Amino acid sequence: MVVATMNTKIGYIEPPPRRAYAMILMLIGSTVISFSGLVIRNIDAADNWQINFYRALAFGIVISTILLLRYGRSAPRKLKVIGFEGACAAALLAFASISFLQAITNTTVAATTFTLSSIPFLTAAMAWFFLGERIGKYTVFTMLAAAFGIALMFIQGLGSGSVYGNFMAFLCAMGFSGYAIIIRRNRGLEMLPTLIFSNLIIMFLALILCWDNMMLSLNDLILCFVPVSYTHLTLPTKRIV
């Protein structure tokens, strides 16, 4: 009893997951992500790496603002304590974001969306393998039925897309699933800094590849700053049980 009280004061006991709150955040994030293809298709002249750079800049500004509002002067210290797994999560998220742009610009929006629909199944399989989380048999049957339907839709979309684009969409799904597993495993750690580091990785790579061509039209710049859905990916993963 004394130990539990001491741990509570120190902050080691994790609050119970708020499932409803997490589901709302996941719904918001998924809804915004579903419009990403439409937004990118309306970009006039910017190439993939220009879009990556300015999207990462927009995400970085939003996430840094949230971190500063939440922690104030102690926010910089949060960037130092994410550890090795936090760094891996940042790298996976950066990889997934870059792969998403490659997919959406090299195949159809439908083919990309169908492939990304496999994220819940990939994540569940990874959670079972790496975290030992159990999956009920009825859930497995439901997942298999849904996966079969998604596979049919994906096969129908292959004819209008490219092999490269579809492959990048699959890599994007793998990256997001791997990121979700790391976040799930580290629920007691503030993981918003991983989003900041992932954006820094993307910006660094984009600058290397297109440092001499960073000028965009006002229309393209505005569209690059529109999506902010990835800020909703951390809390739901940590809280859904």
Regions found by a protein language model. Name each.
Residues 49, 110, 136, 192-193:
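Residues that define the loop-to-transmembrane-helix transition and helix capping
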